[in-house]
Every structure is written in structure tokens, then in C-alpha cells.
Regions:
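Short, cationic-aromatic polyanion-contact patches
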Residues: 3-10, 56-73
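Short amphipathic alpha-helical interface segments
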Residues: 5-31
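A short, conserved structural fragment
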Residues: 47-57
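Short amphipathic alpha-helical interaction segments
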Residues: 34-45
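A local structural micro-motif
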Residues: 25, 37, 54-55
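Residue-level detection of the helix-turn-helix DNA-binding "recognition helix"
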Residues: 18, 44, 48
Length: 73
């Protein structure tokens, strides 16, 4: 795995999240076809760039969704 591949995988995840819905990890994994390692790296990339947010559901399940960054100034 290299930075270029992680960036490509982050693009795959971003396009899935672009429908403005909340996705669970399992849903993202199934829809993206990425391995756990590749999906984790892609989510980490998007989180580091402040492109996504996380929302906790009941139990141990978290959802991932695109964050809206609006800067007025």
C-alpha cells in the first residue's frame, strides 16, 4: 500500500458518501469492495482532511458521513 493507492481508495469512499447519507463501516466495506486495511486507511485519509464526520448509534456501531465545511469571510 502506498499514499497514491490510499488516495484513490479515499476517492472511492468519498464518492459513496457523496449521497449525503450516513453509512456504517460494514455498508461502506460491502459497497466499496475494499479490504479492512484499505478502508481504514481511506477513512483515516478523509478524517485527516476533515472531509468526514462520525456519529455514534446505539451499541458499538458508528456511522460515517461527509462533513459540511462552509467558510464565510
Amino acid at each position: 500500500m502506498n499514499k497514491h493507492q490510499i488516495g484513490l481508495n479515499a476517492g472511492i469512499v468519498w464518492h459513496l458518501l457523496n449521497n449525503n447519507e450516513r453509512w456504517t463501516y460494514c455498508e461502506l466495506k460491502k459497497a466499496s469492495g475494499l479490504s479492512d486495511r484499505d478502508l481504514d486507511a481511506a477513512i483515516g485519509w478523509l478524517a485527516r482532511e476533515d472531509k468526514i464526520d462520525f456519529d455514534s448509534l446505539q451499541g458499538d456501531m458508528d456511522c460515517v458521513f461527509l462533513s459540511v465545511n462552509v467558510f464565510i469571510g
